[in-house]
Curated annotation (Swiss-Prot):
SUPFAM superfamilies in the record: TPR-like (SSF48452)
Organism for this UniProt entry: Bigelowiella natans (Pedinomonas minutissima)
Subcellular compartments: Plastid, Chloroplast thylakoid membrane
UniProt superkingdom: Eukaryota
Gene this protein is translated from: ycf3
Similarity remark: Belongs to the Ycf3 family.
GO cellular component: chloroplast thylakoid membrane
Entry protein name: Photosystem I assembly protein Ycf3
GO biological process: photosynthesis
Length: 166
């Protein structure tokens, strides 16, 4: 089950060592340990661009993880992978699932807004002005909420909103 760390990043190695120690000393259930190990392996694979392996690990982690907050990050990362693979609709599904479990996950709100903004841009290119307005309005709503939750983040979104008088 443990994944070998190919990454030479000091912070990643330190995290792995600390996580392994914590898993051994903290009073956690076997399922919690399995969930965390799969999640950590998923993050490692994802950081190395091994998306299929990362997805397998995240799906396994979801089988064992019961905490909604922790599940939200697993679902969010699955959404990131689908987005990276150009599967925007599938990414949206996972971002929404992440938000259902953790409504304060501003990163998911930002990514949803980004997808809607992209769809708005595509509609403009195809001379679908009314459809583009719908997507841009959705993007604005999600960015506003992301900014409300994380006021020091999302500078480009703030600028876009101010230009559009939103």
């Amino acid at each position: 089950m443990p994944r070998s760390q190919k990454n030479d990043n000091f912070i990643d190695k330190t995290f792995t060592v600390v996580a392994d120690i914590l898993l051994k000393v903290l009073p956690t259930s076997i399922d919690e340990k399995r969930a965390f190990t799969y999640y950590r392996n998923g993050m490692s694979a994802q950081s190395e661009g091994e998306y299929a392996e990362a997805l397998q690990n995240y799906y396994q982690a979801l089988r064992y993880e019961i905490d909604a907050y922790d599940r939200s990050y697993m679902l969010y990362n699955i959404g990131l992978i689908h987005s990276s693979n150009g599967q925007q609709s599938k990414a949206l599904e996972y971002y929404y699932q992440a938000l259902d479990r953790n409504p304060r996950l501003s990163q998911a709100l930002n990514n949803i807004a980004t997808i809607y903004h992209y769809r708005g841009e595509q509609a403009l290119i195809n001379n679908q002005d009314e459809i583009s307005k719908i997507f841009f309005d959705k993007a604005a709503d999600y960015w506003k909420e992301a900014i409300r939750l994380s006021p020091t983040s999302y500078t480009k979104a703030k600028n876009w909103l101010s230009v559009r008088n939103k």
